[in-house]
Amino acid sequence: MNDLAISLPTPAAGAAAPRIGFVSLGCPKALTDSELILTQLSAEGYATSKTFQGADLVIVNTCGFIDDAVRESLDTIGEALAENGKVIVTGCLGAKTGDGGGNLVRQMHPSVLAVTGPHATQEVMDAVHQHVPKPHDPFVDLVPPAGIKLTPKHYAYLKISEGCNHRCSFCIIPSMRGDLVSRPIGDVLTEAQRLFEGGVKELLVISQDTSAYGVDVKYRTGFWDGKPVKTRMLDLVAQLGELARKHGAWVRLHYVYPYPHVDEVLPLMAEGLVLPYLDVPFQHAHPDVLKRMKRPASGERNLERLLKWREACPQIVVRSTFIAGFPGETEAEFEYLLDFLKEAQIDRAGCFAYSPIEGAPANLLDGALPDAVREERRARFMAVAEAVSTAKLQRRVGSSMQVLVDSAPAMGRKGGVGRSYADAPEIDGTVKILPPSKASKTMKVGEFSRVRIVGSQGHDLIGELI
């Protein structure tokens, strides 16, 4: 989870701007909500404080997806109240109901100033204005071109839609974020262009269901750069790829459900327009488990689809997440999942032991497994996943790869850390770059370097500058 307090530029010289403490918890989608709020705060002349003490007010953007996240969010709200006393709560936990149908946050922390759900920038700002009046009207030139970002300058998340039309039995996101609402394609592309112009070298496309982009508006035609563009995944990815090419940048796709039309994007990857990387939330492989999960798409054809993708784009890297120990999962169904993992050769796989989430329909299913069994299956899954990943990484030894540099002490003369096209930030591995043999070879954070792979270590590769 992200736990960030950000210092915004103070726009008004000679006058102390009101200070807002800010904490962002949760997933990249919550992070983009935080960035929107921070951008608006900056535009209106607010600064932020890195500590709760001394701030005029504190905003906590919460996560409410799993029980651990709920506890962390409630604890953070409590800390902010204890240290500051003036707290606005936003995010997924803000939409969660407690006992008797009342708001959970209000029940646990009745003294908070305001509570909103996710993607509620205007509601948050209205609450801020009520308790800490804005110092002046916003002017666009007070805000950096890329807005206020919680990520390093060289990469950023681009949220293309909100909500989800699926009703997976283990998930409560639709109850918190609502049904799918696609952003207008012109707005998405305008934001992407602004990010690239602001120095972003890697754009990570996120949503609850990237493949469903435009379904809610029946793929209506929008406009970008004076030309008609359909609101659908293929058209969006193609336009993002062209923008990235002009700026020498990457586009990476996340939360891609394996619908048949995803096949149309593979040629764009094969020609290098976007990264040959797909983050696909398979969750399981056995058809019966997928039915109990109420997962969309034809799960029994996922292996066939993967093989087709690799035929169209041999260099493609697939990452996915899975759940072990779902209610009713038999040993045979779990073994089926392990066999799928071996045959599918998932490059990057993560696994969670099933955890009941308050309000999720899966809680009502028969066959709940003991904690020990769920954790044991998660460990077995990860052992297989790591063996597959290690073997695939070892095959890269001797090759050369383009790496986006994330860390480079002393201009890289002490070595550095970067990521290849196969590595998304925070969730995948890295490329550890050895100190160069010649002092003339340097690296710079946020720029690309060519690296020869000389070894592997766990989930990471080891390379040397070419």
Curated annotation (Swiss-Prot):
Residues engaged in binding [4Fe-4S] cluster 1: 27, 63, 92
Manner of cofactor binding, per the entry note: Binds 2 [4Fe-4S] clusters. One cluster is coordinated with 3 cysteines and an exchangeable S-adenosyl-L-methionine.
InterPro entries reported in the protein's UniProt record: Elp3/MiaA/NifB-like_rSAM, Methylthiotransferase, Methylthiotransferase_CS, Methylthiotransferase_N, Methylthiotransferase_N_sf, NA-bd_OB-fold, Ribosomal_uS12_MeSTrfase_RimO, rSAM
Entry's EC annotation: 2.8.4.4
Top-rank taxon, per record: Bacteria
Record's function text: Catalyzes the methylthiolation of an aspartic acid residue of ribosomal protein uS12.
Protein name per its UniProtKB record: Ribosomal protein uS12 methylthiotransferase RimO
